[in-house]
Swiss-Prot record:
Organism expressing this protein natively: Enterococcus faecalis (strain ATCC 700802 / V583)
Regulation: Inhibited by flavonoids such as datiscetin, naringenin, marein and phloretin.
Pathway terms, separated by semicolons: Metabolic intermediate biosynthesis; chorismate biosynthesis; chorismate from D-erythrose 4-phosphate and phosphoenolpyruvate: step 3/7
Domain of life: Bacteria
Entry-linked SUPFAM superfamilies: Aldolase
Catalytic machinery residues: 143, 170
GO BP, one annotated term: aromatic amino acid family biosynthetic process
Catalyses which reaction(s): 3-dehydroquinate = 3-dehydroshikimate + H2O
Gene: aroD
Keyword Plastid: no
Self-association state and partner proteins as the record states: Homodimer.
Name of the protein this chain belongs to: 3-dehydroquinate dehydratase
InterPro entries registered for this protein in UniProt: 3-dehydroquinate_DH_AS, Aldolase_TIM, DHquinase_I, Type-I_3-dehydroquinase
Keywords recorded for this protein, A-Z: Amino-acid biosynthesis, Aromatic amino acid biosynthesis, Lyase, Schiff base
Function: Involved in the third step of the chorismate pathway, which leads to the biosynthesis of aromatic amino acids (AroAA). Catalyzes the cis-dehydration of 3-dehydroquinate (DHQ) and introduces the first double bond of the aromatic ring to yield 3-dehydroshikimate. The reaction involves the formation of an imine intermediate between the keto group of 3-dehydroquinate and the epsilon-amino group of Lys-170 at the active site.
Amino acid sequence: MKPVIVKNVRIGEGNPKIVVPIVAPTAEDILAEATASQTLDCDLVEWRLDYYENVADFSDVCNLSQQVMERLGQKPLLLTFRTQKEGGEMAFSEENYFALYHELVKKGALDLLDIELFANPLAADTLIHEAKKAGIKIVLCNHDFQKTPSQEEIVARLRQMQMRQADICKIAVMPQDATDVLTLLSATNEMYTHYASVPIVTMSMGQLGMISRVTGQLFGSALTFGSAQQASAPGQLSVQVLRNYLKTFEQNK
């Protein structure tokens, strides 16, 4: 498996890289969080567009993305609009979802773009092609906030993402018990060991699944998400706590 190199960050090589989400509603707060991220011990920054109060103004989003990028320095920027069906904050039609993304690819500033696996496949494949031509890396993803699918299904979804030309394949699932957490970790190890040609990102959400966020280097997950202020998903740890855990596992692996 080859690492994905974005600016100076090598995703899929060494310890999992830490991503910090920006989940502020206003432009002022978004820019403040972007500036603050320069001093955080993180590797990438994700701007969650579905939290932004003016996301329906595509021109404004593009302009704001450029300002965010400027404030990040050498830290790569991942742009994500998480739909409500996969745990996002805002109702948004699929038509607007793709229209926003196309506008960002043409006029915005970003290094990576998050696209949901189960979005319209024809529209998604067109967007993937367009983004790759612009030098943007694609994170294909799936989030299940209700349950943990079987190990076979988790692996199948990750392989489907890879076949659709994802640069990074991501899945997040909700455990109901400890066995579900083990299912996610086993699926991660199976995918990483037998099938992955690109970096994969997996997590079991909530308090129960927290262990999956700090053991990526043991099972094969290349990114982990840590909060600076407000968490963007259940079970997310603060950046510093996350970094300390990653160092501990690195020293003892």
